[in-house]
């Protein structure tokens, strides 16, 4: 039991750790010579730049970027010198957007969410299964799906994000038991015979629309397009000029 308790303490909320370096977490690496998705112990390096000058950096055991944004900004001593935060879609989440709105209201952020580019495609915009493409009646608060099945607002629900602890609020819509035709009543049910349901997150939708408005403005498009020329060369220099492709444990 003591062994498991010690391991749980080392995990510190992670799913894995290296026995030879407890701070390292097993991750998928970009360099996968065997092409088999092998996991290797490593770190997630975060760097903040301006005009290709590094103004802040940190190492994290989290494989995903979005969990590093908040602690990284908090440990950055010269953050008050800047009025913009620019990052790629790996950092775009409801938690991070909400955090930026609350903690850094004086800074404008240019961060797309994961589905930002995909939502702009013709395939997505014409996909009848997406809630965003359904007809919505704001007055009576109901949706009609691609077949004409009506979904009425049923109740509010909450879900707690295990990785961040954030409580997310949803509106649940349920297919009405009584539709216009028997065929629609059949389509309103799942294979198990229950009424179909869909969930809508008003806060997440608001934050996405706000991020989209900023990114699609002429100024936003220019600022975000410069991100890859500003920060990506830093990692290119580290890897290809200085040969830093792995860390070395000394002890």
PLM feature segments, named:
Residues 1-251:
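Anion-binding and metal-coordination hotspots
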């Amino acid at each position: 039991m003591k062994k498991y308790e010690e391991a749980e303490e080392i995990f510190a909320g992670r799913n894995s750790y290296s026995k030879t370096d407890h701070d390292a977490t097993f991750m998928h690496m970009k360099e996968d010579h065997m092409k088999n998705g092998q996991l290797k112990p490593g770190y997630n390096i975060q760097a903040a730049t301006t005009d290709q000058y590094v103004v802040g950096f940190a190492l994290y055991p989290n494989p995903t970027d979005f969990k590093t944004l908040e602690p990284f900004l908090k440990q950055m001593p010269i953050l008050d010198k800047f009025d913009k935060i620019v990052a790629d879609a790996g950092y775009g989440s409801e938690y991070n957007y909400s955090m930026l709105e609350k903690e850094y209201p004086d800074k404008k952020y240019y961060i797309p969410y994961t589905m930002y580019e995909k939502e702009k495609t013709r395939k997505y915009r014409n996909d009848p299964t997406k809630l965003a493409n359904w007809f919505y009646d704001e007055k009576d608060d109901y949706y009609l799906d691609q077949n004409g099945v009506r979904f009425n607002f049923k109740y509010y629900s909450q879900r707690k994000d295990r990785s961040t602890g954030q409580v997310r609020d949803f509106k649940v819509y349920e297919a009405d038991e009584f539709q216009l035709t028997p065929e629609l009543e059949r389509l309103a049910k799942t294979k198990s015979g229950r009424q179909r349901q869909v969930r809508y997150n008003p806060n997440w939708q608001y934050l996405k629309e706000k991020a989209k408005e900023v990114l699609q403005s002429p100024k936003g498009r220019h600022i975000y397009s410069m991100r890859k020329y500003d920060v990506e060369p830093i990692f290119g220099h580290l890897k290809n000029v200085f040969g830093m492709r792995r860390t070395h444990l000394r002890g």
